Amino acid sequence: MNPERFTEASAVAINAAQQLAQENHNQNLTHFHVLRTLLDNDTASRALTLAGGDLNTARAALDAEIAKLPKVQGSDGQLYLDPALNRAFQKADTLAAQLGDSFVAADTLLLALRGEYRGRGLPDEVSLNRAVTEQRKGKTVTNKTSEQQFDALNKYGTDLTQRARDGKFDPVIGRDEEIRRVMQILLRRSKNNPVLIGEPGVGKTAIAEGLAMRIVKGDVPEGLRDKKIVSLEMGSLLAGAKFRGEFEERLKGVIDEVVKSAGEIILFVDEIHTIVGAGKTEGSPDAGNMLKPALARGELHLIGATTLDEYREIEKDAALERRFQPVFVDEPSVEDTISILRGIKERYQVHHNVEITDPALVAAATLSNRYITDRQLPDKAIDLIDESAARLRMALESSPERIDQLSRRKLQLEIEREALKREKDVDSQNRLLDIENQLKTLTDELNEVRSRWEAERGEVAALREKREKLDAVRTQIEKARRDYDLEEAARLEYGELPALEKDVQDLEKKLKSAEFAHMEVTEEDIAAVVSRWTGIPVSKLMEGEREKLLHLEEQLHGRVIGQDRAIVSVSDAIRRARAGLNDPNRPLGSFMFLGPSGVGKTELAKALAEFLFDSSDAMVRIDMSEYMEKHTVARLIGAPPGYVGFEEGGQLTEAVRRRPYAVILFDEIEKAHPDVFNVLLQVLDDGRLTDGQGRTVDFRNTLIIMTSNIGSPLILEMQQRGEDAETIKSAVMDELRGEFRPEFLNRVDDIIVFDALTAKDLQSIVDIQLGGLRRRLAERRITLHLTEDAKDKLAELGYDPAYGARPLRRTISQYIETPLAREILGGQIQDGSVLNVDYGDGGFTFNSGSLN
């Protein structure tokens, strides 16, 4: 037979059969080899399944037949055609002519081979013939790739109505208005193609699934009754289309099948913007252009879904856009989201085998709405429920902490016992006896705890099984009602269902008092997941954290000396935020710190970051002296489109997007260009900022601190004159109004004037500054002690009211660190010694002694 008579799919199967024969050392190419490789072909395997055959059984039977064939070792690899296969090829040629085919397709070859082999797993010839006819839907093979068009919808699509019948979808709650609008558009005479447009995660695909469920239930107008919704997979259409025209052929097959159904099939294309440009090569049309004629005539019913941004791809092609009717899908409110979560809760309970409490659903909707701002409801709330349930399920299926502790203790004692067995002295033997007794007690306790845990695990497994049965019975009841099988529906509803519900309730009640199996997802679990996602502490305050917050001032006083008013004001803002009383639409707090250089403005910001995040580096620090020119505003929020660096994002916006809970320090704000303050107005008032790429960045969980040296000479002068704090603040505010616009100052929560440091303050700062040196010396096991005289002298030498505490650092470096370095290098001070520093006779003296 002429090899050119075979389609590509048939030729691939025959080549694979030759390879299979050579691998098995068979000299004859038989019908078993070809039939075995043909079962891996899409068209042939689908026809076989459709006819009632069993693919796995057929493959196993053919493998057994091939194993029985004679093997020839060391031959030249020459293959001979088996007479039975030759007959099958002749028959296939005849069948192709009868069907009006120009080439022998894979399904024709399967029919011919079925006549030669009647093994297990294969259907009878009549059923197979019927299946091939049904699959072809009247199409003939006119070229080598024509099979791409056979049963195109089943190959490249998913039947949503069938999935709805099988109970695969979660219930669609709400969205009645959008589903009604989609049905209204589908019933139009022409341009009956709705496209669902909305942000990612608002439930566009769910609307198509909801419509499929309504069609299955019969809850649709007469014009849509018994219609079929098929979801088209653009990826499957494109995958493997190697040659020009192959993609178009597949798509043409889909379009023809939908058009031929005369409105009975509705196509659903998720991410519909992908049809613009899909499959386009030089000189060939894209998918969008191929769909246009059928869409315009109303022959092709199509539902699309895409996001607002990606719909622009379709808007570029006005001729395609006019064929669609947009249906805008808005994000549901928090209340609607809670209703949606209540509707789908059952499915997640069955999947994870846990109980999801109602407060957890409310927490998922409210917390995701407040803290996860870059995604949409209900998607982000569903994700929270899913992850919290998965976390609890993982804990349920892992070994409990109590068993872990006992197992580790047992292992430790066993190692100790083995070591003591080698010792012969009396003490070791007594200790060995003691360990043996401990091990016996521990093993008994471990076995008892383990048996209790195993019993609870058994109950958890039983509950999962019952829940799955309950879910299956509910699906069967729905099906029986749809089919008007009222007897079956009554048997299930009044026979099996109540018994299963009672079993589930009994097991749930029993597991509520379980020692290890904690089955409930609570609002604390949801809060813990939100904290892990965003880094924002939203979980309930622990006792230790309450104490820490109430004594926040004392902690900050340990780092920042002499600034009581500033510390109290900032501490109150943090307490309000953690108690949940701050305005949810503004940052946690915004402060402007004014005062002379070196009095602790930046240090207080670092101390706050350390308190909140356990690291003084965990803050976003923006040095405003870098933003003195007008064009540098773009560096904060990101360059606009068309400029270099557009993709990179802004220094401020990107930092906050990655870490939404942060202390943001704008250092030396008076040095920035006035336009920078216009950017900050939105942040201070609404807690939001739009970056260069149009994304909204959420600042509602940030603490904003701005530092400035404005009025520093005035503060020093007035403090030396002995003026009170209010008079000083009033004078500084007058100077501040000359520098900043009222709308900017008005948005700041509190403007705090830092006091100039006194000589007494500096004595306290000496200890803080020496702390770093002590830590560095501790690495060499050197202990440093300073007498009060030495500290007083350092404070005196380092005191300069105009420069604050910064000269003190230089003083310590000059009078303590430099001489110390010389003595360490000279060998006078050894590692592990105690160093006493004193002041007398006009200089500092260093005496070292052994640590012992």
From Swiss-Prot:
ATP 2 binds at G595, P596, S597, G598, V599, G600, K601, T602. Residues 3-147 form the Clp R domain. Residues 332-535 are annotated as: Linker. ATP 1 binds at G198, E199, P200, G201, V202, G203, K204, T205. Signal peptide: none annotated. The keyword Cytoplasm applies. Residues 382-513 form a coiled coil. GO terms for cellular component: cytoplasm. Residues 757-852 are annotated as: C-terminal. It comes from the Bacteria. Residues 6-69 are annotated as: Repeat 1. It is found in: Cytoplasm. One of its GO terms (molecular function) is ATP binding. NCBIfam families: chaperone_ClpB. Belongs to the ClpA/ClpB family. Homohexamer. The oligomerization is ATP-dependent. PANTHER family: ATP-DEPENDENT CLP PROTEASE (PTHR11638), HEAT SHOCK PROTEIN 104 (PTHR11638:SF18). The Clp repeat (R) domain probably functions as a substrate-discriminating domain, recruiting aggregated proteins to the ClpB hexamer and/or stabilizing bound proteins. The NBD2 domain is responsible for oligomerization, whereas the NBD1 domain stabilizes the hexamer probably in an ATP-dependent manner. The movement of the coiled-coil domain is essential for ClpB ability to rescue proteins from an aggregated state, probably by pulling apart large aggregated proteins, which are bound between the coiled-coils motifs of adjacent ClpB subunits in the functional hexamer. This is Chaperone protein ClpB. It comes from Deinococcus radiodurans (strain ATCC 13939 / DSM 20539 / JCM 16871 / CCUG 27074 / LMG 4051 / NBRC 15346 / NCIMB 9279 / VKM B-1422 / R1). The lineage of its organism: Bacteria, Thermotogati, Deinococcota, Deinococci, Deinococcales.
